[in-house]
Amino acid sequence: MDPRALHSAVRAFVDETVLPSVAGWDERDELPDGVLDRLVALGLTGALVPADHGGPGLGVADLVPAWRTLSQGWISLTGAVNPTGLATALLVRHGTPEQQARWLPRIAAGEVLASFSITEPQAGSDLGRIETTAARGSRGEGLVLDGRKRWVAGGVSSDVVFLLAEVEGADRPSCVVLPADGRGGPGWALEEIDKLGYRGVESAAYRFDGHHAPGAEVLGGDAALGAGARQMLDALDVGRVNVACRALGIIDRALACAVHECTDREIGAGVLGDHTHARLRVGEMVARRAAADALVVRAAAAVDAREDAARELSTAAKVIASDTAVWAVDRAARLAASRSFAAGDELARLRRDAPQTQIGEGANDALLLSLAKPHLEAA
């Protein structure tokens, strides 16, 4: 798979299919099956699978242009492909050879979509408060789960769930690979979460009450018991670049809306863009976008190279890009004034979507605390 060809195909898909339809999808809170099928057919869900497991073996940096362009259409689409990318990173970096052979070729072929689940009602960024448990089956078959999970990305129709749980035999959480064939059955209740923005993409809540999953196992096998938090945070380096690309796509659209207002909206004898204050706002949007873009590109390269700085850079890129996205939408909305408050207006949707990037893959304030911690402890 040529990354440039992928980007070109995504650009055409966004222009021809997404932009003409996104207002209706957002209003109806739907991601049509055909659209998700198209994302799979484009190769976006299996792009990170290595060649020796049947995938194209692309890196995160290869996907930045495609993720960004997809987000110019709708960030929900970029979010829809993200959990399977996280699962791929988990399997490639931490899976046993048997787990890799079981799942990666099917992800590459578009036969399997995954979910990623850390958050619980009482535990978001504080992984030490995880309460979901997984005990060994009575005859040593699989795991028995109890507990609750929230904000399970892709958690309604995925084929496999990677979730953080306290597993019998370890004093720290482990990453459980949970086939989803039992979802909705005995001991596994499902509820879909209605959202203000970031609509269409699945966000689920789970309740486990003694759910026996014969095929469930610990990622990396028993040797990796207690390593789940480290494994899943490692994969989130990939996810934070994905979220940062969502933010870049929002910034791109906010800038386009601002330019349209400046050149199309008549003010007195001229247009809005004739006024210095409007030009200053557009110029600042261009400057801040360039800074966010450079940081995202640098972070993606660091994640691919497994640099020591990858965690810090991917976190910083996500924080800076998402804060810039919310800021840029606000600035564009000020230029558009009442137009941006009308139902169905693109800026009205962006106002609802942009804050998701400040929350997804870690709330920004929690991430800033994590960035500060090693520097303060080393002082």
Give the ranges of each region predicted by the language model.
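Internal helix-loop-helix
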Residues: A41-A101, P105-G110, G154-V160
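A short core secondary-structure module
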Residues: G142, R148-A189
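Glycine-rich phosphate/cofactor-binding loops in nucleotide/flavin-utilizing enzymes
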Residues: L86, A336-A379
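Glycine-rich phosphate/pyrophosphate-binding beta-alpha loops
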Residues: Q72, A123, R150-G155, Q356-A363
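C-terminal helix-coil-helix/basic helical segment that borders enzyme active sites and/or dimer interfaces
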Residues: L19-E27, T263-G270, V286-I320, D330-F341
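A structural signal for short hydrophobic beta-strand segments in well-ordered beta-sheet cores
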Residues: T132-A135
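A short, Trp-centered hydrophobic/proline-enriched beta-strand micro-motif
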Residues: G110-I118
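Glycine-rich beta->alpha junctions and the first turn(s) of the following alpha-helix
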Residues: L6, Q72, L190-R289, T357
